[in-house]
């Protein structure tokens, strides 16, 4: 997802790490340039503020939304809605299958209007971990895990074929197959990135 076109608080900064330059949105610079007191915000609101600074465009993210985060310091509440854009979305199969079906339906609708259906893709990276359809059919044997996964693939072959199609059809979309682990474990051990 591309950053916004505005930089109202001159927070866009650059850091050099071992000769490689990286851009980031500095809360310290934003505080010096009009967002007084934001260093006192709770960490959770600092994450939201950095996200708003990154995507400020005067359309979906406005200066008013950014200032609402700062104003939270006064009353410890806000009625302003903000447009949070996560860098990545983690789904498990029960929420992911309907999402893929929605994307497929949107592509079909775009195609019916004689437009390019390939333009329909997730804006943020999506990782879908298939972990909620495993059932225990065999236990207490050395090959129980392998047998349960084999049965799982037979039982849900149509669903898995659909998800495999989705992974091939859409950009920014990865599938983690069943038998790999639960979504939170897989996320922490394999998928999550420290920086974007």
Enumerate the language-model features and the residues they cover:
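Fe-S-dependent hydro-lyases/dehydratases of central metabolism
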Residues: 1-196
């Amino acid at each position: 997802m591309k950053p916004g076109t505005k930089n109202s608080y001159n927070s866009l900064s650059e850091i050099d790490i071992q000769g490689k330059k990286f851009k980031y949105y500095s809360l310290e610079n934003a505080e010096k340039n009009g967002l007084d007191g934001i260093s006192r915000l709770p960490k959770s609101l600092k994450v939201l503020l950095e996200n708003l600074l990154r995507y400020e465009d005067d359309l979906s993210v406005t200066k008013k939304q950014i200032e609402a985060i700062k104003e939270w310091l006064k009353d410890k509440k806000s009625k302003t809605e903000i447009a949070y854009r996560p860098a990545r979305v983690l789904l498990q199969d029960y929420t992911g299958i309907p999402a893929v079906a929605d994307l497929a339906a949107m592509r079909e609708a775009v195609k019916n209007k004689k437009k390019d259906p390939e333009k329909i893709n997730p804006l943020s990276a999506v990782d879908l971990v298939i972990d909620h359809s495993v059932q225990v059919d065999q236990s207490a044997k050395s090959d129980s895990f392998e047998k349960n996964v084999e049965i799982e693939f037979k039982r849900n072959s149509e669903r898995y074929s659909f998800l495999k199609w989705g992974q091939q059809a859409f950009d920014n979309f990865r599938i983690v197959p069943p038998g790999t682990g639960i979504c939170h474990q897989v996320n922490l051990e394999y998928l999550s990135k420290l920086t974007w």
